[in-house]
């Protein structure tokens, strides 16, 4: 049996390199199309590809040609509309445009080039240039991790990693190679013995000698060991360094009665986008979900996004719970701590100063980055202004933005998590 081992990096995708080069070349067109797709899509529908349309004029290749030298005077008969230097508009209908024009008998043009990008490519462009700000490498034990990966087959290794199939295949090949000539002689001797028994049954001397030769050849073949140390093959596993920083993201969502269903939907969409971003870009990050009204509760992902529980509004309950969880499970000396909070800004008046106090004294000194989005078309209330004071005290690690409609989610998200240049 023949085995074909395909060691190409791209496998069957022979055009992968060309496709990547094409995506780099038209990156601006694709980014613009992705941003438009994000603005019109549901956040739940973000993990699909997208059709990209590039104007035909933008895919023209540059051409080297002779310039128009000298002075030329040309008379174009019948021209009453244009003067020198004006651009002639593309003819309608018969010009090869992409619109719903009527048929025409003149004009020519070029249709837009349309192609499909995959889910992976869509998400790559969607989250390009985004990151968790101030992610630092902690120097604690266990921060540097390694992942074990397959690295082929080795002739030496741990007995527990022996590759039985490769070992038996190697042993079989060795036996065939070393006993090939003996097996050929054995077949000839067996044929000779059959001929002697049929044609010369009385020639006992030759028959006996042939039988002795057959026994000798069989003994030679059987002396070859079934398995030799040379045949042993082992799965080779190597450790690849997987440098990573331990990070945790706290997601705090207001589900009080003042939050309308539309407002809650925008908040959920913002957190779904954040969750998708975190899971795609960071291997080692934990997410803590906290819902709050008059009281706060840590919940799982399913309950965070789909529970219908509601109540009054005391924002400080969520901040207190976050501080307790930080102290209990995520000490700042071990973890990079992030938080994202979404609310409509409605809060019990006496509670807003408490929120500022908890943030300023118990949370902000320990977090890498804290974001607050207020979902309201109305004027800001006390909570927003208290948080502005936090932003003044922590300009590098605190950010707040306002959301009015679902169309603001992606631009605000990019503003909050835009990659900062190192200073």
UniProtKB/Swiss-Prot annotation:
- Residue ranges for the region (Disordered) are 85-107
Give the superkingdom in one word: Bacteria
Residue ranges annotated as coiled coil are: none
Task: Kindly give the Pfam families that the UniProt entry links to this protein.
Answer: DUF444
What ranges does the record list as Gly residues composition bias?
Answer: 92-107
Which HAMAP family has this protein been placed in?
A: UPF0229
Similarity annotation: Belongs to the UPF0229 family.
Kindly give the NCBIfam families that the UniProt entry links to this protein.
PRK05325.1-2 (NF003707), PRK05325.1-3 (NF003708)
Q: Which PANTHER family match?
A: UPF0229 PROTEIN YEAH (PTHR30510:SF2)
Tell me what this protein is called: UPF0229 protein PSEEN0423
């Amino acid at each position: 049996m023949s085995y074909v081992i395909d060691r190409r990096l791209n496998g069957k995708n022979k055009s992968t390199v060309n496709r990547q080069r094409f995506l780099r070349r038209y990156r601006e067109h694709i980014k613009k199309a992705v941003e438009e797709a994000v603005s019109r899509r549901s956040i739940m529908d973000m993990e699909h590809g997208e059709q990209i349309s590039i104007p035909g004029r933008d895919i023209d290749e540059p051409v080297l040609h002779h310039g128009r030298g000298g002075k030329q005077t040309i008379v174009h008969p019948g021209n009453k509309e244009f003067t020198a230097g004006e651009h002639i508009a593309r003819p309608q209908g018969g010009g090869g445009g992409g619109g719903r024009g009527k048929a025409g008998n003149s004009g020519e043009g070029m249709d837009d080039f349309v192609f499909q990008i995959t889910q992976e490519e869509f998400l790559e462009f969607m989250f390009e240039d985004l990151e968790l700000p101030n992610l630092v490498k902690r120097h604690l034990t266990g921060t540097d991790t390694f992942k074990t990966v397959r690295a082929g087959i080795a002739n030496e290794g741990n007995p527990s990693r022996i590759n039985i199939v490769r070992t038996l295949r190697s042993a079989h090949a060795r036996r065939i190679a070393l006993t090939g000539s003996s097996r050929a002689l054995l077949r000839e001797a067996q044929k000779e013995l059959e001929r002697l028994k049929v044609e010369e049954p009385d020639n006992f001397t030759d028959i006996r000698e042939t039988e002795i030769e057959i026994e000798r050849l069989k003994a030679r073949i059987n002396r070859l060991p079934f398995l030799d140390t040379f045949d042993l093959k082992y799965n080779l596993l190597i450790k690849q360094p997987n440098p990573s920083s331990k990070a945790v993201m706290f997601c705090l969502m207001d589900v009080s009665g003042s939050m309308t269903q539309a407002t809650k939907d925008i908040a959920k969409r913002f957190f779904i986008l954040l969750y998708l971003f975190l899971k795609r870009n960071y291997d080692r990050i934990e997410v803590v979900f906290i819902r709050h009204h008059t009281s706060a509760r840590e919940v799982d992902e399913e309950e965070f996004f789909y529970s219908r529980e509601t109540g009054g509004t005391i924002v400080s309950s969520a901040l207190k719970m976050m501080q307790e969880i930080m102290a209990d499970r995520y000490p700042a000396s071990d973890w990079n701590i992030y938080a994202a909070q979404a609310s409509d800004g409605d809060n019990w008046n006496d509670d807003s100063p408490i929120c500022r106090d908890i943030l300023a004294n118990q949370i902000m000194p320990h977090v890498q980055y804290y974001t607050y989005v207020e979902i309201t078309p109305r004027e800001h209330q006390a909570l927003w202004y208290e948080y502005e004071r936090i932003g003044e005290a922590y300009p590098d690690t605190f950010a707040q933005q306002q959301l009015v409609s679902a169309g603001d989610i992606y631009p605000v998200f990019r503003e909050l998590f835009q990659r900062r240049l190192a200073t």
